[in-house]
């Protein structure tokens, strides 16, 4: 029995398992910034550039708080729309189960939104006034994803943007030292790859909920694909969203080895993610329907976190072994 508005209730409402997906883009940006700092040529006795620690910590905290904020918003508005009824296939939600009252959840949304803004505001010091607009966009994403865009097949684009391009590129930019603040093509490619990998989580979620979403008038990308080309198209999308980022990152690593003479010693680590992703795909294909797909959701979340760790290790070991 979970007491209403208890610490345990808030812990479950925060959905701690989703925090790994929020951390992965920041982790990848840190690895890229570390590599670029270490491989920069210095003039004379100039000190080797180092990534900035304070904005690094702020970016990670901001990502986690905004993820929790998004979870609270999703919990509240799905409950208000009546989406979390007895037909729901996904994990239990706090408002629907009565763990947290509507008033308390609205307060929680306000608190996490303000906390996220407070954490993100100092990043203006390191990234300029543009960081304010980035923060506004992130807050808008938290609300518009659940209330509007997810109903019109835009969820996957938003995931690519706000779990890939925005967090990777912005984190990289603000943690680089003065005089080196720029976003190169490699950072952008890594950001796109990250967004695609994280989108596998949304694909599984929407594949599980496809029938309920269709009845509710929620036209997700998965619903549109299945209605036009059948269920195999959704399964193939899941497979591609895992494999395309591997091709991107392995291509980058090989390019660096040729151009920058970095090590490819850790490159085989990508095979670990490839095997895990394919295994999860087969599991998804076999289960196909119902609440059992929640197991696939858990496996996919694990795969995303493993992907982030592998990318971090391959990038860091690439320049560390070269040095």
What do the predicted segments below correspond to?
Residues 160-210, 214-216, 232-235:
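Functional transmembrane core segments of multi-pass inner-membrane proteins
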Residues 23-29, 158-172, 194, 223-224, ...:
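Small-residue-rich segments of transmembrane alpha-helices in multi-pass membrane proteins
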Residues 26-28, 44-73, 132-143, 182-204:
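Membrane-embedded alpha-helical segments that form the functional core of polytopic membrane enzymes
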Residues 1-54, 58, 62, 152, ...:
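Topogenic membrane-insertion module of multi-pass membrane proteins
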């Amino acid at each position: 029995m979970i007491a209403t508005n208890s610490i345990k209730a808030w812990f479950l409402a925060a959905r701690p398992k989703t925090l790994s997906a929020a951390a992965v883009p920041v982790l990848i940006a840190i690895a890229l910034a570390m590599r670029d700092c270490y491989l920069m040529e210095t003039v004379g006795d100039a000190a080797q550039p180092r990534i900035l620690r304070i904005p690094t910590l702020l970016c990670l905290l901001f990502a986690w708080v905004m993820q929790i904020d998004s979870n609270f918003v999703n919990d509240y508005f799905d409950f208000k729309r009546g989406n979390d009824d007895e037909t729901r296939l996904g994990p239990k939600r706090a408002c629907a189960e009565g763990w947290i009252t509507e008033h308390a959840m609205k307060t929680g949304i306000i608190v996490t939104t303000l906390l996220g803004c407070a954490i993100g505001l100092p990043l203006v010091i390191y990234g300029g006034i543009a960081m304010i607009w980035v923060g506004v966009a992130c807050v808008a994403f938290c609300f518009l994803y659940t209330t509007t865009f997810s109903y019109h097949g835009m969820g996957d684009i938003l995931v690519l943007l706000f779990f890939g391009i925005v967090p990777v590129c912005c984190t990289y930019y603000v943690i680089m030292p003065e005089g080196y603040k720029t976003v190169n093509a490699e950072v952008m490619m890594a950001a796109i790859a990250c967004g695609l990998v994280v989108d596998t989580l949304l694909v599984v979620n929407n594949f599980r909920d496809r029938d309920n979403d269709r009845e509710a008038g929620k036209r997700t990308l998965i619903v549109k694909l299945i209605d036009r080309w059948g269920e195999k198209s959704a399964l193939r999308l899941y497979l591609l969203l895992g494999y395309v980022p591997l091709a991107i990152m392995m291509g980058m690593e090989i390019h660096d080895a040729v151009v920058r003479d970095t090590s490819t010693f850790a490159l085989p680590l990508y095979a670990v993610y490839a095997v895990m992703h394919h295994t999860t795909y087969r599991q998804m294909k076999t289960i196909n329907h119902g609440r059992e797909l929640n197991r696939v959701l858990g496996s996919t979340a694990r795969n995303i976190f493993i992907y982030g760790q592998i990318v971090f290790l391959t990038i860091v070991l690439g320049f560390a072994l070269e040095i």
